[in-house]
Amino acid sequence: MGMRMMFTVFLLVVLATTVVSFPSERASDGRDDTAKDEGSDMEKLVEKKECCNPACGRHYSCKGGR
């Protein structure tokens, strides 16, 4: 391949990567907000020494009945 062809392929790859990355970043913003909300809910339960999540259930009791 010539230098022009290699440069053209490089530009196409960069453009395709940029176009593909935009929708995934927008979609992750909403999920991050939800994860932060769930994390704060978990912190509130841990403060009460109560947690039904399997990640913290072995250290705290689960009175919620989950």
Swiss-Prot record:
It comes from the Eukaryota. Residues 1-21 form the signal peptide. GO terms for cellular component: extracellular region; host cell postsynaptic membrane. One of its GO terms (molecular function) is acetylcholine receptor inhibitor activity. Pfam families: Toxin_8 (PF07365). Residues 22-49 form a propeptide. Disulfide bonds join 51-56, 52-62. The keyword Disulfide bond applies. The keyword Nucleus does not apply. PROSITE patterns: ALPHA_CONOTOXIN (PS60014). Transmembrane segments: none annotated. Both the globular (with C1-C3; C2-C4 disulfide pattern) and ribbon (C1-C4; C2-C3) isomers shows no or very weak activity on alpha-3-beta-2/CHRNA3-CHRNB2, alpha-3-beta-4/CHRNA3-CHRNB4, and alpha-4-beta-2/CHRNA4-CHRNB2. Belongs to the conotoxin A superfamily. Alpha-conotoxins act on postsynaptic membranes, they bind to the nicotinic acetylcholine receptors (nAChR) and thus inhibit them. Both the globular (with C1-C3; C2-C4 disulfide pattern) and ribbon (C1-C4; C2-C3) isomers reversibly inhibit human muscle-type alpha-1-beta-1-delta-epsilon/CHRNA1-CHRNB1-CHRND-CHRNE nAChRs (IC(50)=116 nM and IC(50)=643 nM, respectively). Both isomers also inhibit alpha-7/CHRNA7 and alpha-9-alpha-10/CHRNA9-CHRNA10 (IC(50)=1113 nM by globular isomer) nAChRs. This is Alpha-conotoxin GIB.
